Every structure is written in C-alpha cells, then in structure tokens.
Amino acid sequence: MKTRKKISARLLAIMLAVTLLLPLTWNVPVEAAETKQIDVLFSHDTHSHLNSFSTIVDGEQKEVGGFARIKTLIDEKKQEDPDTLVLDGGDFSMGTLIQTVYETEAAELRMLGYLGYDVTTLGNHEYDYRSKGLANMLEAAKDSGETVPALVVCNVDWDSMEQDGLSDGQKQIRSAFEDYGVKDYVVVQKGDVKAAVVGVFGKDALECAPTCELKFKDPVEAVKQTVEEIRKNEKVDMIACVSHGGTWEDENKSEDEILAKEVPDIDLIISGHTHSELKEAIQHGNTYIVSCGEYGRNLGSLSMTQKQDGRWELTSYELIPVSEEIKPDQATQKRIDALMDTVDKNYLSDFGYTREEVLAENDVEFNSLEEMGTKHEELNLGDIMSDAYIYAVENSEYYDGDPVDVAVVPSGTVRDTYTKGDITVEDVFNSFSLGIGKDGVAGYPLISAYLTGKELKLAAEVDASVSDFMTTARLYCSGLNFAYNPHRMILNKVTDCYLTRADGEWIEIQNDKLYHVVTDLYTGQMLGSVT
C-alpha cells in the first residue's frame, strides 16, 4: 500500500511536469527542415503583350512589360528557389499583333511554357476567335512539341451540352481539350510541397464572351465539388485556384471573394479578369486572393509557409514592376522577334504594312488606359476612337452616303492609349485589337445599324445607370450627348438627350425616327440585349 502510494505520487509528479512543459513544447519553433514553404510567381490578363510597350508611369513615358523581362525575373527567382510555382489567371491572348497568329502559332501559350509557367486557365478572350479558333490554337500548341503549361478549368458543363446535343463548335473544343489534356485540376510537386491547382471560369467572364459556345456550371459549386474530390483522392499540402472571376469594390459582388468565403479549403486564389492590381492580398479566413494587374506590367511574387494546423500563411507579397531597369532575356526576345516576323509576313503584308511603320506623329497627351471608364466625363482617347469609327465608315468603299448620326465605343473595347511621338501600325492595332470578323481576319469589323430615338435614349439610360458599376461598359459617343441626374432612380436618370453635329448644332432626338449608328461587332452584340 505504501509502495503504491509512492508510485502514484511519482506518476503524478511526472504527469504534472509533462503538463507544465507541453505549452513550452507547442511554442518551440519547428525546425526549418520540417516547415513547408512555397514561393509563387503569378500573372494574369497579359493579353498577347509578349513585347514591351510604351506607357505613362508617374507622369513619364516609359517602356514596361515584355516576356523577355518576365523571363529574367522568373529565372532569377528560380535560381533562389528552383521549386517556385508559376501560375497564370487566363486572358493570355488578344491585345497585340501577336494575336493574329493565335490559331496557327499558339504563340501566347507556347511562350508561357517557355517562360516556365506551370499552370494557366482560360479567360473570356481566349474565345474571341470562336470555337474553331480556340480549338485550332490548342491543337497548334500541342503539335508544337514544346513544353506548355497545364490548362485547368473545372466548370465546363459538358453534361448539359450533351443533353442538348453538341454543336460542331462544342465538338471541336471538346476534342481539342482532350488532345491538349485540359483538366479540372492538376497536382504539382514543388520540393516537399504537393499542391493541387484548380481552374475556374467566372460568371462575368461568360457575360463578356458573346462568341463562347460552351455552357458552364456555377463557379462556386463547381470549385466546391472539385475541392471535395481533391480532398478525397489526393494527399496534397495546399490547394490553389487560378480563377478568371475577378474582384470588385463591392465585396458582395466580388466573384473571387465570394469563392474564398464559400470554399474555405482554398489556400490561394490567383484572380484574373478584372485587371485588378492588389497592392495587398485580400484575406478571407485562411484564403488569400492576389492580383497583379494587366499586360505584364507587374509580376506577382509571394511566399507562403504552412502552419501547424496544415493551413498556409502568407509571409511575403509584392508586385514586381516589369520596368526598363530589368535586363531582357535575349533568347526570349529572339523568339518573340521571330514571331513578330511571322505577323509581318502572314498578316500585315496583306494590307501593305509592317509593324514598325510610322502612321502619324502625335503631340497630344491622350488619356491613360486606366482613366477610361472611371467616371462620366469626356476623354480625348474615347473621343478619337468614336470619331475614327465615323471617319472609317464614311470613307469605306461600302459607304452608301447616308451620314452617320452616332458612333458608340465602350471603354472595355479600347485596349491601349497613344503616347507622344511616332504612332506605328503596331500602336494602332494594339489600341483596338479585339476579336475577328466573319472572314476570320483579326479585329472586330465595324457595323452600321439603325436605332429609333427611343432606343438611343435607352442606351443613354443604361450608360448613366450601369456604367458606374461596370466601368468597361462606359460609353464614349460621337454625335450623342446627354445630361443626367445621378440621384434619380435607375433607368430614369437622363434629363436631356440630343444629337450634336461637327459644327456644334444640337438636334432633338425624336422617339420614332431612325438614326444611323455605327459601332463594332462586339459592342453590337452586347447592345442587342439592351435595345
């Protein structure tokens, strides 16, 4: 009995000591070898900007961007950490002359592979060349034999399309997806970190893709289901998402913030589509959302460390300016130059141009692209675009002599500004580069239509009511002016609407009269749902 008491006392003392030491043990830092860490580089919305380009930075004209400089940054990072994960959030195409060889050369996707990107996804502009164009591009990328990034998108609704019967375009894309190896997600091993990367196509992205024939599941539900599948079938350390959903100022409408809240198992979201430039990561729970802006002006860089509960903490985050100070990788630039020679030969030669040919000397300080759509005001960049529409139509061989009353240009279709100095063929193309025509030639064609005065007024009402929330839909018009009261009810804000002539004359709009309106095909497709 005495012995048992001694043993009990000793046992109690040992247990007490262990209990007291446990908190100290929990607070001791884990050895570096046991702590998992990952470095990530990322981009999105590069829009065929393989070459550097001239723009205004802090009031000064500078050359920024370019895949040759991005290659330098990626190589430098991989010298520090060979296991760096490199991701892209989609819309890698459509925005420069490079897009003219999209179908035949798959230049953008192949260059992403050459730079060392691991995974990307599809944005709405990958569908600009329609189903056949996207399918041809994917086949060209695969047939090149070069290393290309994995392509992931989890919410294509093939079941729904099959029930309705696949169209020829849908069949083409499905075949190309299968040949390329497009998946819902991929698992990437980076050192001791096993990461799953899922891709998703957002709701607003689909609304901005009038030529897309595919049907899509709800993004949140599709990602949720995919993450459950990953958790069930893959032993991964982290889950990242390359999303073409985007972020908005209104958190309740911000697609990737909604995704982060609804699917909390995601550790990291690379957020494309809205061209957001997040100086600081957005955090919801244990999920981080990051964006670095468009056109390769910046390269996103971050590091994450795994915590003891298995989740990841963002330990560093920066947007690296792809500036003149960064030395371009010469081998990369040589590849880009060869692609540009192909553009000259296969596209521009048909029009009697070369990419570096000077079309005009500019002494005007045009608005920056960032200013477009931010608020209701006259901008000289929007004005010259809409005036150019009228000039082009009235000097076309197809012009029937009926004067154009109104030209309409949404801010989202303007892709670049003009800097002072020489304006080249490439500059002009880049400023208005989207889409293709019925003939398959790059660039959305202009279209003429006749709208009633009532329909013109409705377009003005939509602009006054909606464009504050959807700045890419802000209209810049030549020939149409309106006044509005921002405090009135939606679709009842316009107080006056009239036509203006070049000589300054104001003309009252009559509801039942037809007016000659010019816009581009993309805008015409979008305006069709309004008028």
Where are these predicted regions, by residue range?
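Bacterial N-terminal signal peptides that target proteins for export
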Residues: K2-M15
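Bacterial N-terminal signal peptides
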Residues: A13-P23
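Generic structural marker for isolated residues within well-ordered, non-membrane alpha-helices
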Residues: A17, D256, S386
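Sec-dependent signal peptide cleavage junction
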Residues: L21-E34
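Acidic, metal/ion-coordinating pockets
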Residues: A32-E325, S467
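Solvent-exposed loop/linker segments at secondary-structure transitions
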Residues: H47-H49, M94-I98, L112, R231, ...
